[in-house]
Amino acid sequence: MSKIVKVVGREIMDSRGNPTVEADVYLESGHMGRAAAPSGASTGSREALELRDGDTSRYLGKGVETAVANINGAIAEALSGIDAINQEAVDNIMLRLDGTDNKEKLGANAILAVSLAVAKAAALSKGIELYEHIANLNNTSGKYSMPLPMMNILNGGEHADNNVDIQEFMIQPVGAESFKEGLRMGAEVFHALKKVLQKRGLSTAVGDEGGFAPNLASNEEALQVIVEAVENAGYKMGSDITLALDCAASEFYRDGKYELSGEGKSFTAEEFADYLAELCDRYPIISIEDGLDESDWDGWKVLTEKLGSKVQLVGDDLFVTNTRILKEGIDKSIANSILIKFNQIGSLTETLAAIAMAREAGYSAVISHRSGETEDATIADLAVGTAAGQIKTGSLCRSDRVAKYNQLLRIEGDLNGQAPYRGRQEVNAG
């Protein structure tokens, strides 16, 4: 009764007003799973290919009708009669059908939407929650945890139109006793930050991920206004709330130098590693994502040696959720954590493999959204079902971000104490 009988793809809109792919998968039992692919702004060069039409007469060339046609044609035909409960078989059929290293034939957006929709349909057919089904696929049945959220409350870089070079300034409610309490703490700091910015006469417009995007003089000023907001909200920096950065350094890496144009500064890799280390000395920053360019592996070695024993160093563009690249990083002792994004690799099976490889090597795994999102909240179930321990899904604003937080609240309530919230223990920071 869990055999696939119909697969339907369609073009829908994401949170930035761009088209994306959605898929419905119908089973013999009558159950239907639906999922949508997200899309990134700052993307790693080695990510799986997001197939766009390139027809400038539609959506400025960003249409996804070709990817949708691949779902309604070749993918639907190949998956007809396949058991949805066997996720690996389903994904492998699509990978073989595509036959390329980066999924350029069918599109990672097409394959991913179907892959996740299959998982949702399978969970429904079994009468269980999606996080339970994911745990079964991950061989971690019953071993749940609620993730520590990294809340992106101040945006710069590619996520905002301002002069702040670091892309994301995040808070982590490490002192909370539950996800529900952590979410409340984050929301209170978010509202306190709005008041701090208003008092300074700064913009309270928000960026792609719901964080504020004011024009500030420097990256350090961004940290200063967050510290003020945390204290105004009645919390203590370091014990209640810690900080995390996403530098997205590939976006300001030019000709071997790290160019902070907002501050008029230029650094070598070693100098920028020192710059980050100094920030960590002055502020309770316990996680830094993409601190250096994705291709600057020599620089990453320096950064890891300098900070890796006390700060979580997360590879996003560096590893692109790819086990082959992650293994190379592990072998070379580069970074100590991986950001997990479904659409960087393009299927649920490959995503679970990356999480498993990281865990086996002692690397943490941070489940993540993209800047272009939809109401799809699958990453919430992924975080709980794999007990990854951390999630990054934007600010406490915009329904495309809050949808994931609300799903986590529901899951925590459903599990009623069976999924512990471990706070700072989840962070690979010495």
UniProtKB/Swiss-Prot annotation:
CDD domains per the UniProt record, alphabetical: enolase
Active site positions: E209 (proton donor), K341 (proton acceptor)
Cofactors named for this entry: Mg(2+)
Residue sites binding (2R)-2-phosphoglycerate per the record: Q167, K341, R370, S371, K392
SUPFAM superfamilies: Enolase C-terminal domain-like (SSF51604), Enolase N-terminal domain-like (SSF54826)
Cofactor note (record): Binds a second Mg(2+) ion via substrate during catalysis.
Record's subcellular location: Cytoplasm; Secreted; Cell surface
Molecular function, one GO term: phosphopyruvate hydratase activity
EC number(s) given by UniProt: 4.2.1.11
Task performed by this protein: Catalyzes the reversible conversion of 2-phosphoglycerate (2-PG) into phosphoenolpyruvate (PEP). It is essential for the degradation of carbohydrates via glycolysis.
Protein name stated in the entry: Enolase
Gene name linked to the record: eno
